[in-house]
Structures are given as structure tokens and as C-alpha cells.
Amino acid sequence: MSNLSTHAAQTARRYSVVPRHPRPGAIVVVSAVLLSLLALLPLGFVIGVAFETGWQTVKALVFRPRVAELLLNTLLLVVLTLPICAVLGVALAWLTERTTLPGRRLWAVLATAPLAVPAFVQSYAWISLVPSMHGLGAGVFISVLAYFPFIYLPAAAVLRRLDPGIEDVATSLGSRPPAVFFRVVLPQLKLAVCGGSLLIALHLLAEYGLYAMIRFDTFTTAIFDQFQSTFNGPAANMLAGVLVLCCLGLLLLEAISRGRARYARVGSGSARSQTPRRLSPPLAALALLLPIALTALALGVPFITLARWLWLGGFEVWRNAELWPALWQTLSLSAAGALLITLCAIPMAWLSVRYPARLYRVLEGCNYVTSSLPGIVVALALVTITIHSFRPIYQTEITLLLAYLLMFMPRALINLRAGIAQAPVELENVARSLGKSPAQALWSTTLRLAAPGVAAGAALVFLAIANELTATLLLAPNGTRTLATGFWALTSEIDYVAAAPYALIMVALSLPLTWLLYSQSKRTAGL
């Protein structure tokens, strides 16, 4: 009996040094809290400026015809663009995932590829081809070509993992194929379409270069013009406040439309593999028109336009003295930003996965709310704050990197969460019970398993910074020129030939992002 007690005591002591759910370290918690409070800086700035300005001034600046015009433009842009993107994205997802469309795997990759072309490069391609493209119609057309993959990707992922048995049951009960699609399949695409639509809508509100190039006024272009022309703080800040309200309204609307509905397969057995719906030759030829048309418009026109300008410019365009320094500046800023943001995201991701308490979920949510705000709002907040309170860092790389941190933290956070979730705490505990130190256990289990998620998050941040235009224009130090700002300066001078190499390099840098997003969507579907 005593031997058994002694053995039990030794076992208890051995495992007591490896608690299953230890408390998070103070440094981790404090870091997460400080970063989350920092993330609320732009939102707090807008609210603070509104209170400081006073109701009478706010009313005079907000309730005027110009703001009504901008609001109408924004609403029309969103209301017209989203349904078209939804129809095209879902239709293309259905054709590539659930039918025998010829070359459907190739079309699936090409449907993602427009994300490699920055929206302002897409606009540059079309405006240089059709100089008369201006206004709302042009804005909707180019926005659809630039952003429809944001609905295609999640819709395709859902269709890949959807159990076809559900559709078979509906068919056996007498429903015809169109009724099966609208009553069975489409409701299960609701979450994907709502999420993709929200992402597109936020891009529409935040985009500057696309709409400035086609001379279509939105809140972002108006704020930038106000800031550049008169440095009128109150007017620009009030426009930013209205823009923030629009973004928060979109978040609320998406949450309401999404509802609490969730879809899951229940019952015994596993979902059977899908059998693509066979298309007859005439129907297949007709169905091919959609991916061919979208590929030609979203990819063919930009690449043909770039090839044309590069051909006209010859080798001289590559000898531009500012091109290669701009590439180096872009790579260095992107690398520094990716490293900084990934390191800053680790504490929050760690707490979110290992200690999913309500407080930590709220802290994590602060970062997502801020990332929904347009870059122009973040930049305007940092410009005003640094001028008034931290003048030494105004228009320095510190402020620029801080803006990137506020804007792109969720891109690293989401991937870090997924990576850390691949390394359950039990594996770390087992390693420590086998004699490894906490640091060795962390390195040999958690960090190794989380490495792909860390790398994916850093890559997404790197590529986002490489193509960022609006905040960089406002915050970059004097003399700093990235590929995006260099491209913008040349297109503003109507020097489309000299701008072509900048655009081509940005597209080349974005191609890995396209492949990464496509691969992630396949992994999400379990393929």
C-alpha cells in the first residue's frame, strides 16, 4: 500500500510541474492589451475630433450637399457592385466545382488571378485603353472585375465540401434542378456570400486610386483631395467620420444578414464524393462564355495594356533611375512591416487559441474593427496625432509602419491563430514531461507546427504593404517612393509608358498571394 502511495505521489509531482492550462504570462497579456488599445486609435480619434469640434460645426460640415452627393455615390457604388459580384462569383464557382466544364481546374485558378492585379492598376489599364471611361458606370465595371474573386473563393470552397446527398434527397422528393439550387444549395452559400460581400464593400469604401483615376468622387477621394489641397483638418475629419459610420454600418448589416444560422452535416456515415453534373456539348460551349469573358476582361486587358506600353517604351523604361530604388524601398518596407506585424500578432493569437476567454475575444475584435476602416482614416488619424503630440515622428518610417500595423494586423492574426491551433497544448505538455525545458518544448512542438501559419500570415502582410497606396501617399517620409507611389506619380502625369514597369512588378509580386489564397481555399475544403 505504501509503495502504491509513493508511486502516486511521484506521479502527481511529476505532472504537477506541467499544468494543463497555466495562466498566460503577464508580458503576453500586457502586450495584447496595449496593441488592442492602439488598434482603437483611429476610431477614438474620429470620436474625439467630433466632440472637440462641437455639434454646430459638425452639423455645418456634415449636413451639406457635397456630403449628400458623396454618400449617394458610395451607396450606388456598393448597391450596384455587390449583386453583380455575387452573381458572377457564385455562377463561376458552380461551373468550376459542380459541373464538367472543360478545363475547370484551369478556370478555377484564373478566377482567382484578378486579385494579383491591384485595383488601381486595373483602372490604369482600362483608362489607358478607353480614355472616356469615367463616372459611376466605369467605377462599377472596374470594381466588379477587380473584386469578384472575393465571393468566388469562399463560394467555391463551400461547394467543394457540400454533401451532394442533400441535393439528392431534394431531387428524390420531386424538386427540379433549379429549385434544388435555390432552396438547398444557395442557402448554404449565404455565409460565404455575406462574408465576401462585406469584404468587397469595405474595399469599395477604402479604395482611392481606382476611383481617382476615373474621376469618380467617393468619400476617400474627397478626403484625400481636401487634405492635399487645403490641409483643412475639420472638413477632412468630418468626412472621415461619415466614412467610419458607413464602415460600421456595413459590419452591422452583414452581421444581421448572416444571422445565427449555421450549417452542419449530422447523422452516421461520411459525406460521399461529389459527381460533377455533366454538361452537353452545346451547354458546355455556352457555359464557357462566362469564364472566358471574365478572364479576358479582368486579366487579358491589363496584361495586353501593359505589354503595349512596355513595347512602346522599349528597354528605356527599365532604365528609369527611380524604378529600382522604388523596388528596394518597397521590399524593405514590406519586409520590415511583415516582421513587425507578425511579431505583434503573436501575443493576441496565442491568447485567442490557448485562453479563449471573453476578455481576449473582445481584445481580438478591436483589431478586426480597425482593419475594416479605410487606410485614409488611419492615415489621417496618425497625421493629426503626430503633428500635435509626437512631432518628431511625423512623416517618418515609424509612423508609416504603425499605420501598416493598424491596417494589416488581422491578416497575420488569422493565419497565426490557425497555425497555433495546429499545435495543441497537450503536445507541449508531453514534451515537457519528457524532460524538455519550457523553451525547448515550445520550440520543438508549437513553433514548428505553427510555422506554416506564421509564414502565410507574414506573406499576406508583405504583399498587402507592397501594394498599399493611400496611407503611404500621406505618411511616407519626403523622398520615399515605393512601387505604388511611383506608379501613381507617373500616371498622374499621364506618363503611362513609364508607369508600366511599376505596374508589372507589382503584379509579379502579387502572384504568390493569388496562389496562396487559392491553396488556402482548397485546404479549407479539405482537399
Curated annotation (Swiss-Prot):
InterPro entries: MetI-like, MetI-like_sf. Belongs to the binding-protein-dependent transport system permease family. FbpB subfamily. The complex is composed of two ATP-binding proteins (FbpC), two transmembrane proteins (FbpB) and a solute-binding protein (FbpA). It is found in: Cell inner membrane. GO terms for cellular component: plasma membrane. Residues 71-254, 327-517 form the ABC transmembrane type-1 domain. This is Fe(3+)-transport system permease protein SfuB. The chain crosses the membrane at residues 27-47, 75-95, 107-127, 139-159, 191-211, 236-256, 284-304, 333-353, 368-388, 396-416, 449-469, 497-517. Part of the ABC transporter complex FbpABC (TC 3.A.1.10.1) involved in Fe(3+) ions import. Probably responsible for the translocation of the substrate across the membrane. It is a multi-pass membrane protein. GO terms for biological process: iron ion transport; transmembrane transport. Type- repeats lie at residues 10-15, 66-70, 167-177, 274-280, 319-323, 428-438. Keywords: Cell inner membrane, Cell membrane, Ion transport, Iron, Iron transport, Membrane, Repeat, Transmembrane, Transmembrane helix, Transport. Its main location: membrane.
